[in-house]
Regions:
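N-terminal signal-anchor transmembrane helix specifying type II single-pass membrane topology
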Residues: 2-61
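Peripheral, non-catalytic regulatory segments
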Residues: 103-281
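GT-A fold catalytic core of metal-dependent nucleotide-sugar glycosyltransferases
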Residues: 234-236, 371-422, 790-793
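Acidic donor-binding segment of Leloir-type glycosyltransferases
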Residues: 313, 317-350
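Catalytic core and acceptor-binding pocket of nucleotide-sugar-dependent glycosyltransferases
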Residues: 407, 415, 419-552
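Contiguous segments within soluble domain cores/interaction surfaces
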Residues: 678-788, 792-920
Length: 920
């Protein structure tokens, strides 16, 4: 019996021993990994210093929710927030170009002699090396190298800055004051956020980190850990004896950093009671005198009429309007000079900067404008900055009353609660430098200690006293000097500079978390990284309001929100008309429905030869000249044929009606006798097989070169393409099942340039397809065919214009107009050509004709261009621009109607853009 028990025991041991051994091995591995995790050193430099952790309630969220931005509330958004790729595997190639092989010296890997200079230091940062290589000018390369050397030497930014906020009172306001040792719990942390786990942990490090992130309490635990928290001080029932918090700090063994589940809590100097003010709203009772406002307009582009309309909505003699026009926009600046000469309180900046998106030049412009206003036009209470895409949501009088009732407050919109997320997405821990029209990323940096960092929207309403503090050199202190140094090399600096200056200065108790704006965020469309051509980062921009967004406008009726953005009449003038009617008509404002407005026209300059920013392309100039000849041939002009090339084009404008592009308005002639003609593009879209259900689903098929992914539209409204253009297809689909269609591009010689399969998902959608063709494209009439299972769904024809020698020179024109020297792409497309029924003989004949056309010059080239233009454009009418001698209007033919009385003319009267008293 005993022997049987021994045998059974041995058998049981043999059977279960492997499981026991595996369990012991797993336990040993877990202990080893835990030891490594708590003892691994952490770098004190760069963006990873305190990029630990989410709050405990965030830990259960999916990674897509914690990293995405689409589900967050509008109040938590910065106005131009970045969508940084946090996964290293998804980082952009531009960030890797400066990398050098392992073990190689990064500076030695650069051939500085080829770059034209030798830097003052050994540059090792890969982002800086990448930027220097990509810069196109020697001056910019030197600037980038000098800034990098200063940053590497620790001479670019101050290590610590003073904070003079006095909003908190008593002992709580003393940074570093000990509250004692407290019992912590893994399941219910005393302080909710683990800010860092680092071997650099210590009292000053943890307190400074929590101060930076906006927490009133900092806690040290287990030597390596730093926690931050908000709300009331820790409860006394969890208080422990001080000897439980005696574990040495890894950075300084003479200082203790808490203990095991024992948290040593300190004050950071921020009040535990929220200090942001509540604004007075609604304004009732006795109202003080209206606030005087300095409206600072930073405008770009060519939407002159929209700027005039904005000024008309806000204009009053008691206010001052300071307008900064981007240095690249000569047309806008010249058009607004008339207002300055007529209205004494409208001032145009003479020191103009090219304020690129995200650039430090924007902050430089804002501070410079503030200084000029304070010195030259000092009689104002508030500064409100606007752009050409802003428009008021309420009458001007209500804004004046609101600011008067809240005199002394500063209105800025903060990013929300998660400062660390904002720091990461805004790239605040990286050095940037602006030169050559681009913001270059130069590498990581250490932010100054001692600051409460804040940021959000760069659209603000600031009191005059605060503007004096930040803008006047004689008012600057150590804090302002350091902040200007820091934000002079920061991406989107205006989104953080004013917020941070307010939070750390004597003005910290004047902050109202409301910038008085409604911003139309649609992040799935607006976060398309469309600014990478001017910045080494990825960001978002708000969308233009359309009639479908009226419910968002209507929801602001009873809120202290006075402006909205963005509005663009080339996208929707109707929205601006509705809004203007809503705020000016009490009956409309009382109604929840959108006001009914009639269709109206909108005009915007496309080209003027006198503009210093004229960037017209060769083929566009060719088109404008040909359009004037087309107008002359269709109108009943009796003058002799104009000289070769046609009359001198004085201007070209875009014309819209009912939010639809109608055509181009081309003017020519002399100041005393000019003519404007209206020409419209023909519609060449055709449906395919009527028996194919997919054909009815294709709603729009257009070809252009300037696609806006944010607005899902083509920005080159005339869709004028040349041999060097990059054509793409905008296609819109109705609801239906997912399918794959084939896009076939055919040139004028019936050569299939490319064939591509494009996926169309279920449901309504707008997509853009851009092929990559070798250049130059063959001039002439192209065809784009869309097939489903090789049955025709739809097609459209589009024009690729040749260029004339006057634009590029005879030799260059012949080379460009001759088409490609080989195939457009490296694929055999003969099967597609056979399917389309294009015989070799037909293609050979068309190719020979195309080669002959490409060699045309002089009048023959003009006739070819004019024939192509006439095939794709139609003449709609002409009018006379009356000059000094009205009799000369008849010199070139029958009497034409006056443009001032012609509905479609850009010279017709428009009351909505008449600013101030009528000129005498």
């Amino acid at each position: 019996m005993a022997a049987s028990r021994v045998v059974n025991r041995n058998r049981w041991c043999r059977r279960h021993f492997p499981f026991f051994a595996v369990g012991v091995a797993i336990l040993v591995v877990q202990v080893f990994l835990g030891y490594c995790f708590y003892t691994v050193p952490s770098s004190d430099d760069g963006a990873d210093e305190y990029a630990v952790a989410r709050t405990r309630h965030e830990a259960g969220k999916s990674s897509s929710e914690s990293q995405g931005s689409h589900g967050r509330q509008q109040s938590a958004q910065s106005d131009d927030e970045y969508d940084e790729e946090e996964n290293p595997a998804r980082q952009r190639p531009v960030a890797r170009r400066g990398a050098t092989p392992a073990g190689a010296n990064a500076s030695e890997a650069v051939d500085w002699s080829q770059l034209g200079f030798e830097p003052a230091c050994e540059i090792t940062e890969k982002d800086a090396l990448s930027a220097i290589r990509r810069a196109t000018s020697l001056h910019c390369r030197r600037e980038l190298a000098n800034v990098t050397c200063l940053a590497q030497a620790g001479m670019l930014y101050p290590a610590r800055l003073p904070r003079s906020c006095e909003s908190a009172s008593g002992r709580e306001a003393v940074p570093g004051r000990s509250l004692g040792c407290y019992q912590d719990d893994r399941q219910q942390r005393l302080l909710e956020r683990l800010a860092s786990r680092s071997r650099s942990n210590g009292l000053s490090h943890c307190v400074g980190l929590c101060l930076r992130l906006g927490y009133p309490w900092a806690g040290l635990e287990y030597g390596l850990e730093c926690f931050c928290g908000k709300g009331a001080p820790p409860p006394q029932e969890r208080r422990l004896p001080d000897d439980r918090c005696t574990m040495a700090c890894p950075s300084n063994a003479t200082v203790s950093c808490g203990g095991y589940l024992a948290l040593h809590v300190f004050a950071t100097g921020i009040s535990s009671v929220p200090t942001k003010k509540e604004s007075v709203w609604p304004v009732v009772g006795a109202v003080p005198p209206p606030a005087r406002i300095a409206f600072l307009l930073s405008v770009n582009g060519r939407a002159v009429r929209q700027v005039q309309r904005l000024l008309k909505a806000l204009y009053h003699e008691r206010h001052v309007f300071y307008i900064h026009v981007d240095a690249r926009q000569g047309h806008m600046h010249r058009a607004l000079l008339e207002l300055e000469s007529r209205l004494g309180n409208v001032v145009l900046a003479r020191e103009r900067l090219a304020t690129i998106w995200g650039g430090s030049s924007l902050l430089e412009m804002l501070l410079g404008a503030m200084e000029r206003l304070l010195r030259d036009h000092p009689h104002w209470d508030y500064l409100v900055n606007l752009s050409e895409t802003d428009f008021p949501l309420k009458p001007r009088e209500r804004l004046e009353e609101f600011l008067a009732a809240n005199m002394g407050s500063n209105f800025v919109k903060s990013h929300g609660q998660d400062t660390q997320r904002f720091i990461s997405k805004q790239a605040l821990e990286r050095t940037f430098h602006e030169c050559g029209g681009r913001m270059w990323r130069l590498g990581p940096r250490q932010l100054p200690w001692g600051l409460r960092l804040d940021g959000g929207s760069d659209w603000v309403a600031l009191h005059r006293d605060f503007c004096s503090y930040v803008a006047l050199p004689e008012r600057q202190d150590a804090l302002l000097t350091g902040l200007r140094s820091l934000f002079g090399h920061t991406l989107l600096p205006a989104e953080s500079f004013f917020h941070t200056a307010l939070q750390n200065s004597a003005f910290c108790s004047s902050v109202v978390d409301n910038n008085l704006r409604l911003v139309n965020w649609k992040r799935r469309q607006g976060c398309q990284c469309q600014h990478r051509h001017v910045v080494d980062w990825c960001g978002c921009s708000p969308n233009v309001f359309r009639p479908d967004d009226w419910h968002r406008i209507r929801a602001t009726r009873d809120r202290p929100v006075f402006f909205a953005r963005k509005f663009e009449p080339v996208v929707s003038r109707r929205m601006v008309d509705q809004l203007e009617r809503w705020i000016s008509d009490p009956a409309s404002e009382a109604s929840m429905a959108a006001p009914v407005v009639a269709d109206a026209g909108y005009w915007q300059s496309q080209y003027e030869p006198l503009d210093d920013d004229a960037t017209v392309e060769d083929h566009q100039l060719t088109a404008y000249q040909s359009l004037t000849r087309l107008a002359l041939s269709r109108a009943e002009f009796t003058c002799s044929r104009p000289p070769e090339g046609g009359p001198h084009v004085r201007g070209v404008s875009l014309y819209f009606y009912g939010d639809q592009f109608q055509g181009l308005l081309v003017s020519w002639g002399s100041p005393s006798a000019s003519t404007e003609a209206f020409l419209s593009p023909r519609n060449h879209q055709r449906n395919g097989d009527a028996d194919l259900p997919v054909s009815a689903r294709l709603r729009l098929l257009q070809v252009g070169s300037q696609y806006d992914p944010k607005e899902q539209m083509l920005r080159d409204f005339p869709r004028l393409l040349g041999p060097r253009s990059e054509p793409g297809a905008l296609h819109s689909w109705g609801a239906g099942r997912a399918l794959a269609v084939t896009f076939v591009w055919v040139d004028p010689a019936k050569v299939v340039a490319g064939s591509y399969e494009v996926r169309v998902e279920s449901g309504p959608q707008t997509l853009f397809h851009r092929p990559d063709f070798r250049k130059p494209l063959r001039p002439g009439a192209w065809t784009l065919l869309v097939f489903y299972e090789w049955r025709l769904v739809g097609q459209t024809r589009f024009l690729v214009l040749p260029v004339v020698p006057a634009a590029v020179g005879a030799e260059a024109a012949a080379e460009v107009n001759g088409g490609p020297r080989g195939p457009y792409i490296d694929h055999d497309l003969s099967r597609v050509e056979e399917h389309l029924g294009y015989s070799r003989e037909t293609r050979a004949a068309l190719k020979a004709q195309a080669d002959t056309d490409g060699r045309r010059t002089g009048r023959e080239l003009e006739r070819w261009v004019d024939a192509l233009i006439a095939e794709f454009w139609t003449f709609r009418g002409a009018c006379s621009i009356r000059g000094g001698d009205a009799a000369e209007d008849d010199r070139c033919g029958a009497r034409l109607p006056a443009c001032e009385k012609t509905e479609w003319s850009s010279f017709s009267y428009e009351a909505t853009v008449q600013v101030g008293p009528a000129p005498t």
